[in-house]
Amino acid sequence: MSKTLALTEELIALSSVTPEDKGCQSRLIELLEPLGFVCETIESDGVTNLWARKGTTQPLLVFAGHTDVVPTGPLEQWTSPPFVPTQREGKLYGRGAADMKTSIAAMVVAAEEFVQAHPAHKGSIGFLITSDEEGPATDGTVIVCNALKARGEQLDYCVVGEPTSSDVLGDTIKNGRRGSMSGKLTVKGIQGHIAYPQLARNPIHQCAPALAELVAEKWDDGNEYYLPTSWQVSNIHGGAGASNVIPGNVVIDFNFRFCTASTVDGLQKRVHAILDKHGLEYDLKWSISGHPFLTPKGTLSDAMSDAIKSETGVTTELSTTGGTSDGRFIAQICPQVVEFGPPNGSIHKIDEHIEVRFIDPLKNIYRRTMENLLL
């Protein structure tokens, strides 16, 4: 069994459902310290974070990831227990197999091979690992980034081990992500008997034309890196639970996934303008979980693309699609951030898995990326 596969199985066996780490990071420290990494545990409100660094010079290449996993869902629906790593028909099954314990194992073993083969390499190598990526993400990577910024540690490159590949290992690198902004809109009416609408004001009827306009609005055209900004309603809550009562208010939850062609302020102003145009009495609360970030084609993306091509023969595509990730926090302190990892078709699903044939090539791609940047 390869060292990367063995470490992946070790990590899967630790049931680190967010925000628990369950000893994953302690195991990583055991492997990193003998290589010369100075390891620091940073805890915040029940979340365990690891910052490890070898070297004190630039450039600093950081590998980032998360040891927490999403809940398993119904155990009886799993073909094998989610925290008992199991190989069947060329696949390794277990919660975290794809998202993202294989990536973490591959990064650590790649660093071990690189350091042992090139003890006099230039620059520094870092690891930023958290147990709060799948949860609120308020006490994880963002806490470490703030600490690093406060003490003046400069990151030059960061590779986040998110499962970015689509069909085969290496077909997709994420070189950016869209921002995410949510709104909770409460439209106020006047409750009353449904037989006497003249004595009430139905907020559902009132907001319908405004919602139709928001749905039809073209927010921007996107750009060469991003799809156009999208606006989606996720929930509508209204009614008193009876069929003969006009509700007093309706609550609408919506979300923007926005690109660099739009701004937070600009989108908010346009939403308010549409609501005001329709004469609604409303309250709107905004929350921003991440701003868009982008690493244009350059040193880091080229180094990783070359590593993928050399290892697999695959020509990779740069993409900014998908949800948010911890890359949004790291991009605030690091000029070049990309995400790369195994295929994502089974992530967060029952019987999550990775094809065993991809595990060592993933490790080799991470090692080749180090060679391209630090030799």
UniProtKB/Swiss-Prot annotation:
Domain of life: Bacteria
Entry annotated with the keyword Transcription: no
Residue ranges of coiled coil: none
MF-aspect GO terms: acetylornithine deacetylase activity; cobalt ion binding; succinyl-diaminopimelate desuccinylase activity; zinc ion binding
Catalytic residue list: D68, E133 (proton acceptor)
Subunit structure: Homodimer.
Name of the protein in question: Succinyl-diaminopimelate desuccinylase
